Every structure is written in C-alpha cells, then in structure tokens.
Amino acid sequence: MIFHTGTTKPTLVLLCCIGTWLATCSLSFGAPISKEDLRTTIDLLKQESQDLYNNYSIKQASGMSADESIQLPCFSLDREALTNISVIIAHLEKVKVLSENTVDTSWVIRWLTNISCFNPLNLNISVPGNTDESYDCKVFVLTVLKQFSNCMAELQAKDNTTC
C-alpha cells in the first residue's frame, strides 16, 4: 500500500466542508434556483399577473383600453433574462406608485427577483402623458398589467406545446 503524507487529508476535508457550506448558502447569494422552484415561481407569476390585470381592468379601469404604443418586453429565461426582468420590475414598481399602492405588485417583483440569477438593474421608466392626470396613469397601469399578463399567457401556451 502507498500512504500519502502531508496535507492531502486535511485539504480534502476542508474542500468537502467548504463545498457543503457553499451548496447550502448559495441560494442566498444569487445562485440559480432549482427547476422545481422555477416551475412553481412561473406558475405563481402566471396566476398573479392574470389576477392583477383582471382586478384592475374591472375595478379601476372599466371601459378603458390599453395604450399599444407602450411596449413591455416579454418574460424570458434566455440571454436577455436579466434585462427583460429588470425592465418588467421597473414597470411594475411604477405601476405600484402610480396606482397609489392600490395595485400591489410586491409579490410579483419579489418572484421575478428570485428567479433572476443576478440583482436586477435599477431602471427609471418614463410614463407617457401627464402623470398628474388620473386617466393617463390608469391607461399606463392597465397597459403594463395587460402586457405582462399576455406575456405570461404566451409562456403558458409555449409550455403546453412543448410538454
């Protein structure tokens, strides 16, 4: 038998301990989430986006139509994920402010942040029209909620065709 002398054994023990520590702590440092958690989060986003849009369009923007000139990127998990998620989060934060917190987007923002591998970029979204006008604010909020809901529904359709 060949016996190794030196620091091999302590190094392996240290490596195993650090590897275990990193594996248990990595989720809090922005590591990718598991596929199960991702699937659950996407399902929650789909449902919440639809609920937010339906509630707002019925209760606060009845009879109004969305502004087609405002374009929100669709949700994706490809190379543009960080940028798309950052833009969506910025729009949803603006929705919360413009609706005077009557539209609570905090859960959606939290879920989007959780599935992003990096911290989302801080973006400033300009609102078309006069923000002092209630109508312009409502149209903006309705448009963002509708587009986000539609994007999540399209994601649902793509999921159903690939399964």
Curated annotation (Swiss-Prot):
Additional information: Il31 transgenic mice develop dermatitis. A similar phenotype is caused by local delivery of Il31.
Entry GO terms, CC: extracellular space
Keywords associated with the record: Cytokine, Glycoprotein, Immunity, Secreted, Signal
Stretch forming the signal peptide: 1-23
Subcellular location, principal: secreted
InterPro entries attached to this UniProt entry: IL-31
Role description: Activates STAT3 and possibly STAT1 and STAT5 through the IL31 heterodimeric receptor composed of IL31RA and OSMR. May function in skin immunity. Enhances myeloid progenitor cell survival in vitro. Induces RETNLA and serum amyloid A protein expression in macrophages.
Positions annotated with a glycan in the UniProt record: 55, 84, 124
Keyword Secreted: yes
Keyword Glycoprotein: yes
Protein's cellular compartments: Secreted
Gene: Il31
Protein name per UniProt: Interleukin-31
Pfam families: IL31
Gene Ontology molecular function: any one: cytokine activity
One example of a Gene Ontology biological process annotation: immune system process
